[in-house]
């Protein structure tokens, strides 16, 4: 696995020429075929097998027969072909494949400086979209492509909607101001800059291409995942099964796992991702910390409440309390970062879908997924659920097991999300107090337990009977943790 130089630019290229069914080795076809193949090969070798120094990508640098034979041999060796120095059919087959355009030659396996990001949380922004796909599809493709890398290393990607991000993503046409113009359909597909200031990490896609989430056209997830590898500091791999192999090959976005070679390469830069498979650390008694919230105060409330396995979790500021459902003993506070480092503090909402073994934690316009206490990839955007853009945060969430609906509370309204269909129900949002008789005030947290929904609003917890459609009792919120 190679690592991209700090000044490196990677471009994904697809040749538009068709295969010649009658072309034997050494151009023994028509003179036109021979000339076309020769010029195509010369351009390819100059682009990918010349150490260009300060030259722009794609610039013609070296000429001459002996130099070309040497480059052909380099190409053949890189792709595991029989090394002859001749432009035989197999070699031309490789030359005509769709591929990424970062050169295949380098002075070192790890380039001088080993360019990489110096922080673990990176921002990204999609500033321009393509008409080939809906914005939601583009958002999803980019998120999944970044998640492919964060699953292997301790990097998190947070999407922002304004300002300058570490990784600026856009769909461009022609000359777009970075000295690497696009050339229309079936030419250069995309390019990405290595980690660094300014253009570092930025990833551009040719808007003239037909982008899809399927096998037709060019699969955006496949190209984006490859280019983000460059944006994180990787060059090409000689392993044909690797995502960072130079030639384009469709990858199914769903169920994709980063190949071993790519894992090895990215972990050489950033180290392996630490997983949290066990139980969180619980101190042997309340921490002696003056900033610990006084949860037993008469006015105290919770930010979020959720089931997690057979336990209940209660969140407040940077602390959470953990208790067995039917036991009130052994309840102790712990910092959120001790078990959920990426959440830090101030969780807005949380809920569990027990049938999937997954829990969802919300903070601002983002959410995280866990299996038990193990984080599953980077943060995602709440707009995946179908929220309108004016919704910036979720106040509370509760999953109803019988109906497989999840209710999201925002202000004095709530939304209903169908977990089976993975989309919002129609005719929402609705007014919370009108739909849930007896529940007053803004909902801070909610959880379903033993057929009841418990709504937490300030210091009160309303026990709501879903069959009677009414509140049957009102408790103190902090009574749930022994106050």
UniProtKB/Swiss-Prot annotation:
Pfam families: Hemopexin, Peptidase_M10, PG_binding_1
Keyword hit for Nucleotide-binding: no
Hemopexin repeat windows: 293-343, 344-389, 391-439, 440-483
Chain positions recorded as Zn(2+) 1 binding sites: 100, 226, 230, 236
GO MF annotation: an example: metalloendopeptidase activity
Keywords: Autocatalytic cleavage, Calcium, Disulfide bond, Extracellular matrix, Hydrolase, Metal-binding, Metalloprotease, Protease, Repeat, Secreted, Signal, Zinc, Zymogen
Main location (coarse class): secreted
Biological-process GO terms, alphabetical: amelogenesis; collagen catabolic process; extracellular matrix disassembly; extracellular matrix organization; protein catabolic process; proteolysis
Catalytic residue list: 227
Disulfide bonds: 296-483
Compartments, record wording: Secreted, Extracellular space, Extracellular matrix
Post-translational modification: Autoactivates at least at the 107-Asn-|-Tyr-108 site.
Xref: SMART domains: HX, ZnMc
Binding site for Ca(2+) 1: 164-166, 197-198, 200, 202
Motif (Cysteine switch): 98-105
Role noted for this protein: Degrades amelogenin, the major protein component of the enamel matrix and two of the macromolecules characterizing the cartilage extracellular matrix: aggrecan and the cartilage oligomeric matrix protein (COMP). May play a central role in tooth enamel formation.
Name this polypeptide is given: Matrix metalloproteinase-20
Gene that specifies this protein: MMP20
């Amino acid at each position: 696995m190679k690592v991209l130089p700090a000044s490196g630019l990677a471009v994904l290229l697809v040749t538009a020429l068709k295969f010649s069914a009658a072309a034997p080795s050494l151009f023994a076809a028509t003179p036109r075929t021979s000339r076309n193949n020769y010029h195509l090969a010369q351009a390819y070798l100059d682009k990918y097998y010349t150490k260009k120094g300060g030259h722009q990508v794609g610039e013609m640098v070296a000429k001459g027969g002996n130099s070309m034979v040497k480059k052909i041999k380099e190409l053949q060796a890189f792709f595991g072909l029989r090394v002859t120095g001749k432009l035989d059919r197999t070699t031309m087959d490789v030359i005509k494949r769709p591929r990424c355009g970062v050169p295949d030659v380098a002075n070192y396996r790890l380039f001088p400086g080993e360019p990489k990001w110096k922080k673990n949380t990176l921002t990204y922004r999609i500033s321009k979209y393509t008409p080939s796909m809906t914005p939601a599809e583009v958002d999803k493709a980019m998120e999944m492509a970044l998640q492919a890398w964060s699953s292997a290393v301790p990097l998190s990607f947070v999407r922002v909607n304004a300002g300058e991000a570490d990784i600026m993503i856009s769909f461009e046409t022609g000359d777009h101001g970075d000295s690497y113009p696009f050339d229309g359909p079936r030419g250069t597909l995309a390019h990405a800059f290595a980690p660094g200031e300014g253009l570092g990490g930025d990833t551009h896609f040719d808007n003239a291409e037909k982008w899809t989430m399927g096998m037709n056209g060019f699969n955006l997830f496949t190209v984006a995942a490859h280019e983000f590898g460059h944006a994180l500091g990787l060059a090409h791999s000689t392993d044909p099964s690797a995502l960072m192999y130079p030639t384009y090959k469709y990858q199914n976005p769903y169920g994709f796992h980063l190949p071993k070679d790519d894992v090895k390469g990215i972990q050489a830069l950033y180290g392996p991702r630490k997983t949290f498979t066990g139980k969180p650390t619980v101190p042997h008694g309340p921490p002696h910390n003056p900033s610990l919230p006084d949860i037993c105060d008469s006015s105290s409330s919770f930010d979020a409440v959720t089931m997690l396995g057979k336990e209940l979790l209660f969140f407040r500021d940077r602390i959470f309390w953990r208790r067995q459902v039917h036991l009130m003993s052994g309840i102790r506070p712990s910092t959120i970062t001790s078990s959920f480092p990426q959440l830090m503090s101030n969780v807005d909402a949380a809920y569990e879908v027990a049938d999937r073994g997954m829990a969802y934690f919300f903070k601002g316009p983002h959410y995280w997924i866990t299996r038990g206490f193990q984080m599953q990839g980077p943060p995602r955007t709440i707009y995946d659920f179908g929220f309108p853009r004016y919704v910036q945060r979720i106040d509370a969430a509760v999953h109803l097991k019988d109906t497989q609906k999840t209710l999201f509370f925002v202000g004095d309204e709530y939304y209903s999300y169908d977990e089976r269909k993975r989309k919002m129900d129609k005719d929402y949002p609705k007014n919370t107090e009108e739909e849930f008789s007896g529940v007053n005030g803004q909902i801070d947290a909610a959880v379903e337990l033993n057929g009841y929904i418990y709504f937490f609003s300030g210091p009160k917890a309303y026990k709501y009977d879903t069959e009677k459609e009414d509140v049957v009792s009102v408790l103190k919120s902090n009574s749930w943790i022994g106050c």
